[in-house]
Amino acid sequence: MNVIYDFYNNGAEIGRLERGLGIVEFHRTKEILARYIDGGKVIYDIGGGIGMYAAWLAKKGNEVHLIELAENAVEYAKANMMQDCQFIAETGNALQVNRPDGSADVVLLMGPQYHLRDRGERLQSLRDAFRMLKKGGLLVAAGISKFSSMTWALSVYGEKKNASLMEFLDDPVFFNMIKGEMTTGDHVRPTEYPKFIAESYFTTAEEMKSEIAVAGFTVDKAIAVEGCIWFTPHLVEKWEDEASRERLLDIVRLTESEPEMMGMSPHFLVVARK
C-alpha cells in the first residue's frame, strides 16, 4: 500500500487525463457515467485521485465526496479543482470509508479495485461500497485489462521514438512483467521502469463481474472504455478532428459491450446495483 500511496502522492494523476490516451479515457468515462447519473445524487468517489471526475459530477448538480488515499492528491483537488464547483475532499481508505450505511446514491470505485492485489481486500472494498449505498444504489467500478501492457507493447514494437526503438518486448525484465500480468493478473512494477503504474491487479471483465456479484450486487453490464480504438495510428491528431473523433467514438460505442473486445480495452467499467 505504501508504494501505491507514494505513486499517487507524488502527482501521478496530475495531467494524466489531459494528454494522449488519457483524453480518450476521460471522455469515454464521462460519457458512460452520464448515462446513469444526472443531478441531485449523493456520490462517493472512492480513490478519485485529484478530483477530475468529482469536479465534473459536482458541476452537474451532485453532492460529491472525494475520498482519496494520497494526501497530496486531496490537497491538489482542494487547491485546483474547485474554482467553479464545490465538493467534499478528504483522505480515506477504500477498505473502510468513514460514511454511514445507506447514505449514497452512487459509489465510484474507479481505481481501488485494480490496486488491491489481494482478492479478500477487493471483496472488502466492494462490501464497504455495498454498505454505504442506498437500496437500488449504483456502483461503477473500473478495471484494467490483464492484456493491456502486452497489447500496448505490441502496438509500438519496432517503432522509433526520440531516436530510440520501442522494443520493450525484447527486454526480459519487461517481458517477465507482462507474463505475470497475463498469467496471474499481478502487475509488479520493475525498478527499471519507475514511471509505470504502481503495483496493481489486472483482470478480466468476467472476473470483476464475479467478484462484484459475490459482494452482494446485481451486476448490470461491463463496458469497454477506450475499446479497440486506442491503437489507432495518429490517434491524438485524429481525435482533434471532430469528424474523425466521432467515427472513432461510433466504433467504440458499437463494440463496447462485446465480450471479445473487453480484453483489448485498457480500461473497462462494470455497472451494478445494490
Predicted regions and their residues:
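Conserved class I S-adenosyl-L-methionine
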Residues: 1-39, 44, 52, 56, 138-178
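Class I SAM-dependent methyltransferase SAM/SAH-binding core
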Residues: 44, 52-96
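A short acidic, Gly/Pro-enriched loop at the edge of an enzyme's catalytic core
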Residues: 95-107
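A short SAM/SAH-binding and catalytic strip from SAM-dependent methyltransferases
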Residues: 106-120
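Acceptor-substrate binding/catalytic loop of class I
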Residues: 116, 192-207
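A short glycine-rich, Lys/Arg-flanked "PGG" loop and its adjoining helix->strand segment in the class I
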Residues: 123-135
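C-terminal lobe and adjacent flexible extensions of AdoMet/dcAdoMet transferase-like proteins
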Residues: 207, 211, 215-274
